[in-house]
């Protein structure tokens, strides 16, 4: 049985598949979930970050939740390190927290705020503030950590956050999502004001924008079996992407360094809403849209089918148990 979780405006949606039919349940109803993470060592331990409700943890697959008492309420990003089990949470205003006891206690990683670029961090809709949009612990190295500030840059630490390198050369400053390849330690990927990738564990980045006529990218995911095959969602610009016009959204795939190719195969062309969440697993790919639609591909994006799961905005996706 495959299990999928979606962070939505309604709360956490839990989807379980049996005989190619999805059963849907709503958890944390009305919470306005923004982000999700799972403990790689215990798939029943989940973390949910809420827009204005703090951070919550479940140890029974989402049936029951407790407040983890994070010092900030607006949680924009979560991650659990596969290398050492550390839990990270990023907030608005931009603060980064770490827990080494599964969310029972927290300490702030204050060194992030000592970067020289910090005074320039500013989120355009709320220019007086910014937020930690994405946290990406390297799955092989417990000290290696990438953090994306919206809008401020892509920051890197090699010692678990004790010290930081400021915005990395070649990376996009408007960071929306980051990914490591699960099996190739040095390969990393970014979506934001455009797309970029790294082959040296995030030290430096190369832009990858050729072939896309939509340059405002949002979500990024990578083929677990092929570090040279990755995907982004994109729109014509930030205002259209976030509900102020026709987003003209697409999903693109890049293979072997070739230009980006738009994906169709059953998807509306263009999509009526930006895919806020892309997720590639060992056997499938999912796209969660800003209007609540969920699409699925079983052939690495060549063809797609609607899951007939609809609801509020899907902000994040998490797959477990063979999905």
Predicted regions: what they are:
Residues 1-323:
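Extracellular glycan-interacting surfaces
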């Amino acid at each position: 049985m495959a299990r999928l979780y979606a962070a939505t405006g309604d709360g956490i949606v839990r989807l379980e598949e049996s005989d190619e039919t999805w059963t849907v349940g709503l958890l944390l109803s009305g919470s306005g979930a923004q982000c999700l993470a799972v403990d790689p060592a215990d798939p029943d331990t989940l973390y949910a970050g809420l827009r204005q409700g703090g951070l919550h943890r479940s140890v029974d697959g989402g049936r029951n939740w407790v407040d983890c008492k994070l010092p900030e309420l607006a949680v924009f990003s979560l991650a659990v390190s596969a290398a050492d089990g550390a839990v990270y949470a990023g907030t608005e205003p931009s603060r980064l927290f770490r827990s080494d006891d599964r969310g029972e206690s927290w300490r702030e990683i204050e060194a992030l705020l000592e970067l020289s670029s910090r005074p320039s961090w500013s989120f355009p809709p709320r220019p007086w503030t910014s937020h930690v949009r994405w946290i990406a612990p390297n799955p092989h190295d417990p000290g290696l950590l990438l953090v994306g500030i919206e809008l401020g840059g892509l920051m890197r630490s090699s010692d678990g956050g004790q010290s930081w390198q400021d915005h990395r050369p070649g990376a996009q400053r408007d960071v929306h999502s980051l990914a490591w390849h699960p099996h190739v330690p040095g390969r990393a990927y970014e979506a934001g004001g455009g797309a970029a990738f790294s082959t040296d564990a995030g030290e430096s980045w190369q832009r990858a924008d050729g072939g896309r006529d939509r340059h405002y990218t949002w979500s990024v995911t990578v083929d677990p079996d092929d570090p040279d095959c990755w995907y982004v969602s994109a729109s014509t610009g930030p205002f259209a992407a976030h509900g102020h016009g026709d987003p003209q959204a697409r999903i693109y795939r890049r293979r072997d360094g070739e230009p980006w190719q738009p994906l169709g195969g059953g998807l509306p062309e263009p999509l009526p809403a930006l895919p806020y969440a892309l997720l590639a697993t060992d056997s499938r790919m999912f796209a969660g849209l800003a209007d609540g639609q969920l699409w699925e591909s079983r052939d690495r994006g060549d063809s797609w089918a609607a899951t007939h799961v609809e609801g509020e905005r899907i902000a994040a996706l998490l797959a477990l148990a063979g999905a």
